[in-house]
Amino acid sequence: MAANRDYYDVLGVSRDASDAEISKAYRKLAKKYHPDLNHEAGAEEKYKEVNEAYEVLHDPQKRQQYDQFGQAGMNGQGGFGGQYGGQGFGGADFGDFGDIFSSFFGGARQQVDPTAPQRGADLDYTMTIDFMDAIKGKTSEISYSRSTTCEVCKGSGAEKGTHPITCDKCGGSGMMTITQRSVLGMIQRQTTCDKCTGSGVIIQHPCHNCHGKGVKTQKQTLQVKVPAGIDNGQQIRLAGQGEAGKNGGPYGDLYIVFRVRPSKDFTRRGQTIYTTVPISFAQATLGDEINVKTVYGDTKLKIPAGTQPNQKFTLKEKGVPSLRGGSTGDQVTTVEIVIPKSINEAQRKALLEFVKASGGSIAPQEKGFFERLKEKLS
C-alpha cells in the first residue's frame, strides 16, 4: 500500500469502529473505486488499497496485531520480514509476534467465542435491466444460490435427538495455547484447535441432511422490485436474503447491483434525459411545432423562428423520477439543423431569391467537366 497509509484512514473509520461500520465503509468505497465502475486514473490502485485495509480490519486476529504493531505486524510472521521471519534466529518459531509481547507484559488476546451466534455473510447479485425499466421501475424475478439453515438439525450440525459436545482438547474455546522456547525465553502462542478445527464443539453424530455442516446450499427465487429512477451501478439491499448465520445467528443481506442497458434514443445523466432531434433549415428559420420522443411518450415542442444550430430546449418533468420521491428531472432536447445534400431547381431558385432579398450574394459555382463538355457538343 502506498506510503503505508493507516488502514483506518483508508476506510475512513475511527480506530474503535465496529465490524458493521468497517464493512459498511468498505462496501461503499469498493463500489466507488471498482475498476468496472470507475475508469479514472488511480481508481484501480485505490480499490486494491481499500481491499487490503478491509482484509486486515475485518479479521479480529489481524486487526489486533495491526493495532499493536501497525504495518510491521503485517509483514511475514509476527512482523519479522526477510530472513528473520518464521524460523529465523536459529530455528526459533516466533509464530504470532503479538503473543510474544503478551507473554512478557501479561497481555491476553481477546478471544471470540466460537459457539456464539454469528451473522451470515452478505451476497452480491448483478441484475441487468433495460433503460426504460430503470426509469419507470418494474418487478422482476431472480434466482441465486445461498446457504440456508438445515431444517433437520436447525443449524446444530448434529443428528436429530443428539447435540454437539464441548471439545475436550480446547475446552470449547476453539484455540490452543502452545509454549515454546525461543532466544527471548519461553513464549506462548495460540493456534486453532486441531481436534474441533476452531468450532469449540465436537459433533459425534453428524446430521444426515447437512452432513454436520448445519447449513445446506439451496436455490432461492425472489421477486425484486426495481425502484423507478435507479441508475447504472446503484444497488439495493434485501435484508436477510444472504447466507445463513452460524449458531443461531441472523442471515446476511443480499445486495443487488444494477446494470442498465443503454438506449438508442436517450442519454441519461443523473435525473436529466438528453435527446437530439433533426429539423430542416426552413423549420429553424420560420419556426414550427414538432413531435419529440420522451421516456413517457411523444410530446409537442414549439420551435421558434430563428432557432440556431444545436440550440437546447428543456421539457420540464420529462426526465427521471427521484429515488427518494419528490421532483422528477427534465429532458433537454438539442435541435440539429439538417442541410440537404441536394436540391431541385425550384428550391435552388427560391434560395437564391432569399439570398438576394437578404442583401447578399452567392458566387456562381464552377461548372464541372462533363457540363462544360456537354455545352461544347451542343
UniProtKB/Swiss-Prot annotation:
Intracellular or extracellular location(s): Cytoplasm
GO cellular component: cytoplasm
Keyword flag Transcription: no
Entry keywords, A to Z: Chaperone, Cytoplasm, DNA replication, Metal-binding, Repeat, Stress response, Zinc, Zinc-finger
GO MF annotation terms: ATP binding; heat shock protein binding; unfolded protein binding; zinc ion binding
InterPro entries reported for this sequence: DnaJ, DnaJ_C, DnaJ_domain, DnaJ_domain_CS, HSP40/DnaJ_pept-bd, HSP_DnaJ_Cys-rich_dom, HSP_DnaJ_Cys-rich_dom_sf, J_dom_sf
Single Gene Ontology BP annotation: DNA replication
Cross-referenced CDD domains: DnaJ, DnaJ_C, DnaJ_zf
CXXCXGXG motif repeats: 150-157, 167-174, 193-200, 207-214
Claim: Chaperone is one of the keywords in the record: yes
Coarse class of the protein's main subcellular location: cytoplasm
Domain J: 6-70
Segments forming CR-type zinc fingers: 137-219
Residues that bind Zn(2+) 2: 167, 170, 193, 196
Cofactor requirement: Zn(2+)
Pfam family, one: DnaJ_C
Residues binding Zn(2+) 1, per UniProt: 150, 153, 207, 210
Co-factor binding details: Binds 2 Zn(2+) ions per monomer.
Record remark: domains: The J domain is necessary and sufficient to stimulate DnaK ATPase activity. Zinc center 1 plays an important role in the autonomous, DnaK-independent chaperone activity of DnaJ. Zinc center 2 is essential for interaction with DnaK and for DnaJ activity.
Assembly behavior: Homodimer.
Function: Participates actively in the response to hyperosmotic and heat shock by preventing the aggregation of stress-denatured proteins and by disaggregating proteins, also in an autonomous, DnaK-independent fashion. Unfolded proteins bind initially to DnaJ; upon interaction with the DnaJ-bound protein, DnaK hydrolyzes its bound ATP, resulting in the formation of a stable complex. GrpE releases ADP from DnaK; ATP binding to DnaK triggers the release of the substrate protein, thus completing the reaction cycle.
Family per similarity comment: Belongs to the DnaJ family.
Name recorded for this polypeptide: Chaperone protein DnaJ
Source organism: Lactobacillus delbrueckii subsp. bulgaricus (strain ATCC 11842 / DSM 20081 / BCRC 10696 / JCM 1002 / NBRC 13953 / NCIMB 11778 / NCTC 12712 / WDCM 00102 / Lb 14)
Gene: dnaJ
